[in-house]
């Protein structure tokens, strides 16, 4: 049994803290800043940080790794095809890594960065996905390094995970993502309801995560490239027909980049 909590960092990052309460051991995902993790460990001195899991190389995800490694000796696991500080275990598609007693499958999800990975496990009572900056709540990451031909299939793969899978992404972008989702599907009742729910949460400065794969299928335009109305909006934006899922995705992403 693990407990998952968010440690806020910077303006909108979340460092995910996985806790094995029985054994007083923990792991963190994407510690862009060491300070929130250090503060938690100081407040919980009988706990041990055993593992640091990294999804990609951007500094807001790895900036705290070196300090935490020095302080705790935690094992650092991250993508094999990217430069990750202090990495002990290089991970690629098909690998597995165990942290706090939970075994995670490593999924290659290129697009945001070329070597980006995600961590999925169906061992907990509810399956969990740590998606980094690939899949966001109601959105997806920008393609800083990859192509639509890489990222759309990566997102479709995540969308095929069990619908009750909890999605732990790395940023609090949900409300702005839903504003875009409303522009794409202004009559989608699931989008409208989620927008209202998230607006209330953010008004109280509350976290909007985790999401679920099921909710993303209903409300995330980047997972809905097969929906007729989504394609129509993408066609309107580009001024021509987008004949493939990749083309629809690329149109949506370019629209979102300027939204």
From Swiss-Prot:
The keyword 4Fe-4S belongs to this UniProt entry's keyword annotation: no
InterPro entries associated with the record: Clx_II_MBL, Glyoxalase_II_hydrolase, HAGH_C, Hydroxyacylglutathione_Hdrlase, Metallo-B-lactamas, RibonucZ/Hydroxyglut_hydro
Top-level taxon of origin: Bacteria
EC number: 3.1.2.6
Binding site for Zn(2+) 1: 56, 58, 112, 133
Example GO biological process: methylglyoxal catabolic process to D-lactate via S-lactoyl-glutathione
Pfam families, per the entry: HAGH_C (PF16123), Lactamase_B (PF00753)
SMART domains, sorted: Lactamase_B
GO MF term list: hydroxyacylglutathione hydrolase activity; metal ion binding
Keywords: Hydrolase, Metal-binding, Zinc
Cofactor(s) this protein requires: Zn(2+)
Cofactor mode of binding and number, as noted: Binds 2 Zn(2+) ions per subunit.
Positions annotated to bind Zn(2+) 2: 60-61, 133, 171
Metabolic or biological pathway, per its Swiss-Prot or TrEMBL entry: Secondary metabolite metabolism; methylglyoxal degradation; (R)-lactate from methylglyoxal: step 2/2
Catalytic activity: an S-(2-hydroxyacyl)glutathione + H2O = a 2-hydroxy carboxylate + glutathione + H(+)
Physiological role: Thiolesterase that catalyzes the hydrolysis of S-D-lactoyl-glutathione to form glutathione and D-lactic acid.
Quaternary structure, from the entry: Monomer.
Family note: Belongs to the metallo-beta-lactamase superfamily. Glyoxalase II family.
Protein name per the record: Hydroxyacylglutathione hydrolase
